Amino acid sequence: MDKNIIIGAMTALITPFKNGKVDEQSYARLIKRQIENGIDAVVPVGTTGESATLTHEEHRTCIEIAVETCKGTKVKVLAGAGSNATHEAVGLAKFAKEHGADGILSVAPYYNKPTQQGLYEHYKAIAQSVDIPVLLYNVPGRTGCEISTDTIIKLFRDCENIYGVKEASGNIDKCVDLLAHEPRMMLISGEDAINYPILSNGGKGVISVTSNLLPDMISALTHFALDENYKEAKKINDELYNINKILFCESNPIPIKTAMYLAGLIESLEFRLPLCSPSKENFAKIEEVMKKYKIKGF
């Protein structure tokens, strides 16, 4: 299998709700907007997609909508398929594969704090259950466990279809260390604030929250960097600084969904508890940044 399979500019899709249910029409419309604005892949039902509060049926529906909407285009679907129970993660991975996803993104098991050996066996079981690309997802600030550099490299070398890692630890040194020890690995940025540093240090793509709102800018930033035009990439990165900052003023995806609502891109600003709407102060800050960027609706 070609391990360079799903790279470039990717969007961690939000999941719009309406009257307490997944707004399927809005979801498909958001994906079409990504397709039209230069995104290489969409990532349904990840952290930004509120996967933790979706039912398994809703999770599967979102994957099906993404696959159907991207059918016939060059845009790939990297479906979220993570769980803190290995058998559930395997089941989600198999569903994604059987329903046409091009690959899966699998977050490290959360809450139960497995050892590195447990993490290795967890991911090996997932990789062996499907024959599509698997991207590891390291986000210790949410999961409570870190996939070590050694474990990531061992999984990459032992499992043919594990092609890289989405790094959202905020640790640039770790990212550089990973590529120094295994330069064939596909390192993907999982934090908009460090997209440019990762891309300019050998990263091969981003999974962006900001690109829900500004897919064209994230696409341009990513492709300039991949073409080694770092001057233009940094210019765009600098332009995105303020909005990247405000889109993480509260827990993701609260700010990005608020921004999408203010821009008229989703009909209803709904979350599922324990997530809730932003504070009045942060709502006002998001509005102000939207005005500065002259985003649709302002």
Swiss-Prot record:
Annotated GO MF terms: 4-hydroxy-tetrahydrodipicolinate synthase activity
Compartments where located: Cytoplasm
Active site: Y137 (proton donor/acceptor), K166 (schiff-base intermediate with substrate)
Annotated catalysed reactions: L-aspartate 4-semialdehyde + pyruvate = (2S,4S)-4-hydroxy-2,3,4,5-tetrahydrodipicolinate + H2O + H(+)
Disulfide bonds: none
EC numbers, comma separated: 4.3.3.7
Claim: Protein transport is one of the keywords in the record: no
Residues the entry annotates as binding pyruvate: T48, I207
Keywords: Amino-acid biosynthesis, Cytoplasm, Diaminopimelate biosynthesis, Lyase, Lysine biosynthesis, Schiff base
Site (Part of a proton relay during catalysis): residue numbering on this chain: T47, Y111
NCBIfam families cross-referenced by the UniProt entry: dapA
Record text on subunit structure and interactions: Homotetramer; dimer of dimers.
Record's function text: Catalyzes the condensation of (S)-aspartate-beta-semialdehyde [(S)-ASA] and pyruvate to 4-hydroxy-tetrahydrodipicolinate (HTPA).
Protein name as catalogued: 4-hydroxy-tetrahydrodipicolinate synthase
Gene name linked to the record: dapA
